[in-house]
Amino acid sequence: MSSEDRHLGSSCGSFIKTEPSSPSSGIDALSHHSPSGSSDASGGFGIALSTHANGLDSPPMFAGAGLGGNPCRKSYEDCTSGIMEDSAIKCEYMLNAIPKRLCLVCGDIASGYHYGVASCEACKAFFKRTIQGNIEYNCPATNECEITKRRRKSCQACRFMKCLKVGMLKEGVRLDRVRGGRQKYKRRLDSENSPYLNLPISPPAKKPLTKIVSNLLGVEQDKLYAMPPNDIPEGDIKALTTLCELADRELVFLINWAKHIPGFPSLTLGDQMSLLQSAWMEILILGIVYRSLPYDDKLAYAEDYIMDEEHSRLVGLLDLYRAILQLVRRYKKLKVEKEEFMILKALALANSDSMYIENLEAVQKLQDLLHEALQDYELSQRHEEPRRAGKLLLTLPLLRQTAAKAVQHFYSVKLQGKVPMHKLFLEMLEAKV
């Protein structure tokens, strides 16, 4: 991986590895006076932020996200009321402004989310052409070419590999949209004289569940990579550094993900923050659990960072390993599907134990919507198990207990000053304790 691809922005005082990175969050700025003594940050993700005593700036996910002259910027007092003044994240950090996203492939300005990833029109078209044409590329060098806005055309092989690495989905490309593809497909069916061609086809009835699950699946991370630092010796410091950096990047993605939950954006800004601050660790742990399902007695913190019991013991994470593994075994026994995990993540957010809810009725309405979505999904997909929705909901208390253990563990790491922690992860951690 080149230094250019690893660097998140010239305006940031420090950086972590982001290739591949989670999609941008749509958050404007981070500003909070930390109990641990951090200075107030007044810039956006694209502006260098002041750091904690043991803290680093969270990665800048956007270009041109500065707050100067931004009509959407509000003062902390204007945005929050009473109880939220002590919140670990100021409301201007959330959804007031939509700065420019960066293409995760080449760093150009992203035009939106294409095939599951924030990307520019050029990389979107390149990926589509490659998949539809079933094109194979060969790198003339060592398969490690830098892919930037200026050099993205220099090596198609490395550009395509980076598309896949940051999470672009091959399945998202419609093969029948190749020029002339639909006509060819139709002629082929006609030639087969299938007896079913003349039967009327009625589209399946669309329920609210379909929209909810589609929204959640559409913004779900496909692959997550930790990319452990090579300059730190193996041991507890390397493991903790890797996991803290990973959590910080996941949090940026998580906040963007939450905006796509039907009903969540309509909550007050204060309630959005309260739910996120309360449930973020539960959501991250559900991600670990889902990635760990294919393995036996191992935890997949990321695609390239998998720990067994012995590794966990050596780096001081044995208690956390056992707690999360208990959840993995429970979900394995239930044979939980991806769609169910997506709904459970949303439910974990909505069922937060936060005491700082401003509009309880609106939050309860969101809870009811998601409970109904889970029940509808089970009725339509697992109708042979009438009690399945209830069994899944009964896993949430254990999830909350496990998340509490994880928060306490990493907060103790923070107090010991063992490893540097990026600003977003650190502030969410402090808000939870």
Curated annotation (Swiss-Prot):
Entry-linked Pfam families: Hormone_recep, zf-C4
Region (Interaction with NANOG), start-end ranges: 93-211
Gene Ontology BP annotations: cell dedifferentiation; cell population proliferation; embryonic placenta development; in utero embryonic development; inner ear development; morula formation; negative regulation of DNA-templated transcription; negative regulation of stem cell differentiation
Effect of mutating K259A: Loss of self-renewal in embryonic stem cells in absence of LIF. Does not interact with NCOA3
GO cellular component: condensed chromosome; cytoplasm; nucleus
Top-rank lineage group of the source organism: Eukaryota
Tissues in which the UniProt entry reports expression: Highly expressed in undifferentiated ESCs. Expressed in immature horizontal cells and in rod photoreceptors at intermediate and late stages of differentiation. Expressed in endolymph-producing epithelial cells.
CDD domains given in the database record: NR_DBD_ERR, NR_LBD_ERR
Expression triggers: Induced by NANOG. Induced by GSK3 inhibition through inhibition of TCF3 repression. Repressed by TCF3. Reduced upon differentiation induced by LIF depletion.
Family under the similarity heading: Belongs to the nuclear hormone receptor family. NR3 subfamily.
Biological role stated in the UniProt entry: Transcription factor that binds a canonical ESRRB recognition (ERRE) sequence 5'TCAAGGTCA-3' localized on promoter and enhancer of targets genes regulating their expression or their transcriptional activity. Plays a role, in a LIF-independent manner, in maintainance of self-renewal and pluripotency of embryonic and trophoblast stem cells through different signaling pathways including FGF signaling pathway and Wnt signaling pathways. Involved in morula development (2-16 cells embryos) by acting as a regulator at the 8-cell stage.
Entry protein name: Steroid hormone receptor ERR2
Species in which this protein is naturally found: Mus musculus
